[in-house]
Swiss-Prot record:
Required for maturation of ribosomal RNAs and formation of the large ribosomal subunit. Disulfide bonds: none annotated. CDD domains: WD40. Residues 10-92 are annotated as: Ubiquitin-like (UBL) domain. WD repeats lie at residues 104-142, 143-185, 192-231, 250-288, 290-329, 335-375, 379-417. This is Ribosome biogenesis protein WDR12 homolog. GO terms for molecular function: ribonucleoprotein complex binding. Belongs to the WD repeat WDR12/YTM1 family. The keyword Nucleus applies. Keywords: Nucleus, Repeat, Ribosome biogenesis, rRNA processing, WD repeat. It comes from the Eukaryota. It is found in: Nucleus, Nucleolus; Nucleus, Nucleoplasm. It comes from Drosophila simulans (Fruit fly).
Amino acid sequence: MDVDNGEGQVQVHLKTKQEHYAVPDVPYAIDGTVTTVELNTFVNALLRQKDGSSDTEFDFLVFDEYLRGRLCDHLREKAISFEDAIEIEYVERFPAPEPQDCLLHDDWVSAVKARGKWILSGCYDNSLNLWTNKGKHILTISGHTAPIKAVDWISLDEETGRFVSTSQDQTAMLWKWNVGSNAVDCVSVCKGHERGVDSVSVSPDGLRFATGSWDTMLKVWSAELDDGVEGSSKRMKESGVRTPKITLQGHRESVSAVQWMDATTLLTGSWDYTLKVWDLSLEGIKTEISTNKSIFDASYSKLNRLILTASADKNLRLYDPRTNQGSVVRNTYLGHNAWVQTVMWSTTEEFLFVSGAYDNQNKLWDCRSPKAPLYDLLGHGDKVLDIDWSNPKYIVSGGVDNSVRVFKSRKALAEDTETK
């Protein structure tokens, strides 16, 4: 660590929030040309001196961004003086997800959603499919008359599962699944959109769901078995047809993404280059964020309150809906080689998210690492259309190669280790 390669030495303090990996809190003089390789060697040497610890792989954050090259280059890029004492935070490296299963379908898989030990998928052959997260096919469900575009779970317990699907046939359908008998009934057909329904999201309490469509409309529906609409015609009730509770107009192109931010707030993304935050209590737009590309997907994190977008280019972008500057991108993530179709934040890890693109790849990211993903999740043989990390144990994706790919995440890998 004392070799001088012409960049000089830097005074650093090594910090970690993982107390069992803490090293003495004193300044260290290190060469400016070090990378994560040399820093890992140095920190592990300090830990061995402290308590004889075995080697651990770490990542290093300098001014809230992952170090991906030489320390001196990182500091220059951020206009930081070499004479300042630099704080470097180190964190145990997130383990690489491991491929578990490939679930083969008869057509493109355009929608996936995991919950508990089940995976729900939707296809371009108009069918829905239920699988276990161990790869066993449970059920094929017919009902839609055009390709499925989105799915979401409403509720799930040991006896009953309820979920919603949307389709290019201009409808959303509510389903009730008897887990024991493995029988599914369509509870309601939701009609009101005038073009294909591209996106769906169920409210946190499971009582409502929202849909976005090519007709540019956002609609909110009851997700209850009995929607309780007084005055609905007897014919509509008997036929199982359901109409929207709320219709919101504001987008100029397809509403390609929708998500509940909380009980009364919705996020939408559109091909019209905008993100919109809707206040349902006022039935109007609360915030609008202008972007420079058509938005294919958007994801809001309840942990960090930030929004990610997948767009008609190779980049993912990070926005803060709380800012007063509605068009400012907080960060751009570079790594895909084709249009990015789908993105989702982790529901349990504040900084992590996953993406899928037309380059046939899924990627796992840390939002503090804009220059490169943590890992490439390989397996798809064609474009990725949807990705899901609702179940913290599994990253699940569907694509044009007619497959769902299942990857074990850290929580599942940890359980495997404990059971060995």
